[in-house]
A protein has these predicted regions:
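Short, conserved beta-strand element in jelly-roll/cupin
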Residues: 56-60, 68-85, 124
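Double-stranded beta-helix
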Residues: 7-38, 112-146
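Short, low-complexity cationic-aromatic patches
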Residues: 1-6, 45-51, 63-75, 107-116
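Short loop/beta submotifs within extracellular cysteine-rich repeat domains
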Residues: 65, 84-86, 129-131
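Short acidic-glycine-tyrosine-enriched beta hairpin
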Residues: 1-4, 87-107
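Glycine-centered loop/turn positions within well-structured domains
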Residues: 41, 73, 83, 101, ...
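A short glycine-rich, His/Asp/Glu-containing loop-to-beta-strand
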Residues: 29-66
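Short, conserved secondary-structure segments in the cores of folded domains
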Residues: 55, 65, 74, 90-91, ...
């Protein structure tokens, strides 16, 4: 029984059994470079190649992001700041803290942040990174010939 005054968004890939993990707090800047001077951090990595992952996206103030697509859908929640998600066909979707959204696969879009910048946590249902049975930290750093 969950009680309280807060709100929750659950993004789930049916059939996937994820690992329990606790992350945070969200940092002011991402640890990796992203397009148009934005940054990103992998908050919850894929346990295996192809598994879902959770990422932080940080947009500095007044960013006009390059129009782009993703090969799979994206779920997002606006953590802080304000801006818009732009699609050439449907126009602008205003973004504000606490708002959740879904971008369908191959949906052309870009984010534009305002003077506050914009912070988004994005769920990716798949990943092109992650360990495999042939490539993983345990196996890669085990030497049977020494």
């Amino acid at each position: 029984n969950i009680q309280g005054q807060g709100e929750c968004a659950i993004f789930r890939k049916f059939g996937h059994r994820g690992l329990f993990s606790v992350g945070g707090p969200i940092e002011a800047n991402g640890r990796l470079c992203y397009i148009d001077n934005c940054t990103t951090t992998v908050l919850s990595p894929a346990a295996r190649l192809g598994d879902p992952c959770l990422n932080l996206l940080v947009f500095p103030e007044n960013v006009k992001q390059t129009l782009h697509i993703h090969p799979s859908l994206r779920y997002g929640i606006v953590v802080a700041g304000r801006g818009v998600c732009v699609n050439p066909s449907t126009g602008e979707l205003p973004l504000r803290p606490g708002m959740t959204f879904c971008l369908e696969e191959t949906y052309p879009h870009c984010f534009n942040s305002d003077k506050e910048g914009l912070v988004i946590v994005a769920y990716h249902p798949d990943s092109d990174m992650g360990p495999t049975d042939q490539q993983n930290p345990m196996l890669n750093r085990t030497y049977t010939r020494f």
